[in-house]
Each structure stands twice: as C-alpha cells, then as structure tokens.
Amino acid sequence: MSRIFVVYGHHNVNKSFNQEIRDTFCSEAKKLGHEIDLINLHAEKPIPFYDGSEPSEQILDYRKRLEQSDVLFMISPCYNLRATAILENWIDLVLAPKWFFSFKR
C-alpha cells in the first residue's frame, strides 16, 4: 500500500477537532494497510523562519521522508483563511522551489 506523510500543525494536540481528524485519518489509513509517517510540528525541534539560507539537516530529513512517501496529508486549523504559521513556515522551507517544483521559462 501507500506510505503517507502526515504533517500536523496545531498547537492543541489533545483536545481539538484537528486532533480528531488526525487520529481518525491515521487509524483508518492503517486499517487499509497504509504506512503512516506522522510529524507534530509543535512537538518537533522548532525550525527557523525562511531567510534564504541553505536548508538545515532537519529540513533535509523532512524532504527525505517526503520523497519516501506516496501521499502528503497536512492538517491545520484555518485562521483568517490560512493555515497556522507553523505549518506555513514548514511549507516555505520544505516545499521550496527548485526542490519541490520549478518554474517553466
């Protein structure tokens, strides 16, 4: 089956609707035979804000795990029509141009 990389970006890890989504999704996916690689951004070592520097070992590790996955599933509450800052920062650093995508000329 598929390997699913789950990125959880909510500060309330025990009593939130997002936590219920995370737990239900992971449980049901495992029942179907999928492998789950879950990170909780609030439990991980904090990553710096994007400043244009070379990616850290932590970011390279996230990219490696993503490359080994078939599916990326991100979970975050929506504040002012946006994901949480911690998830948006993760997206900026991990899913960066030239590595995750490129622009056509």
Question: Residues of each region from the PLM?
Answer:
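Secondary-structure boundary/capping signal
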Residues: 33-36, 98
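N-terminal beta1-alpha1 ligand-phosphate binding loop
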Residues: 2-34
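Secondary-structure boundary/capping motif
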Residues: 1-5, 65-68
